[in-house]
Amino acid sequence: MLAKAVSAYRAALGPRLIAGYALGSLAHGGFSPLVSDVDLGLILQDPLRAKDRMTIYKVARSLRTGGSTLDERLSVFWGTPSTLRGQRRGGRFPPLDRLDLLDYGRLLTGQDARSSVARPEQAELLVAGAEFALGYLGGAQKLPGRLRDWAPLRPRDDHVLNEIRAPSQLVSRGPRRLTKVVLFPVRFLFTAETGQVGTITLAAEHYLAKAYAPAASLVTAALAWRLEPPTDDEATALLGRELVLLYVHYIDDHITRLRAVNRQRLADSFRRWRARLLA
């Protein structure tokens, strides 16, 4: 899939394509054919052009219609040296994915250009993860424009809070959605604490090693569900017992962290998210 995507972007972008990278689990390990995304990172020559976004979008849309499940999961991150250094806005390379590029990016084509990428600070990773969670996991009723590209898998009906409170709805969406909803908070906690991306397995092991790890059985089970789907009854029962506990733990942790870096408005959004979750 990535070879096909790289070829398509080479044809569309020509010499402006400096480098292409495998990202995510295809770079740092832990890829699951059942649930994992196919992440591609592109670095283009400056200057950024007005038509770049549409070019990237059109090629990605065409590739996603290739007919396979993996084709549908393609996610493309892109920028130029100036956007990746933070000198100008544009492109699509959130801090978490920039860190992934720096630490794990696997060069697929072109010349390695990661020296032009600014390493995000830990507070930036915390805030970016929190903003993504508010959009993707149901805390924000409306996602700001600059964040819409960050959460392409966000459910259109914005009913994730209902999924958390009524686990049978979440199970009915399939193992990909199910494992993301369970394991994203675990991964965000790991990054907030360590300043690292790492694999989902590493993040889960870090979480489970703690003396206080709410929903430990659910986190352990979700790792297995990435490889083999659970039975509906098994998953629904476990989610019903532990999913809200996991989210309350994650939200409370991040309220404290966000206040510590003077992001009071974002912390307040998390507090409102908690209230809606428990209503």
Task: Annotate the PLM regions.
Residues 224-279:
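Terminal (often C-terminal) interaction modules
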Residues 9, 13, 63, 207-208:
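Broad structural signal for hydrophobic residues in well-ordered alpha-helices, predominantly aliphatic
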Residues 196-227:
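Short, charged amphipathic alpha-helical segments flanked by flexible coils
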Residues 54, 58-175, 179-182, 188, ...:
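Conserved NTP/Mg2+-binding pocket subregion across the NTase superfamily
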Residues 1-21, 51-53, 279:
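Helical scaffold of the NTase/Pol beta-like nucleotidyltransferase catalytic core
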Residues 22-24, 28-58, 73-78:
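Catalytic metal-binding acidic patch
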Residues 186-195:
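Extended, well-ordered alpha-helical segments in internal regulatory regions
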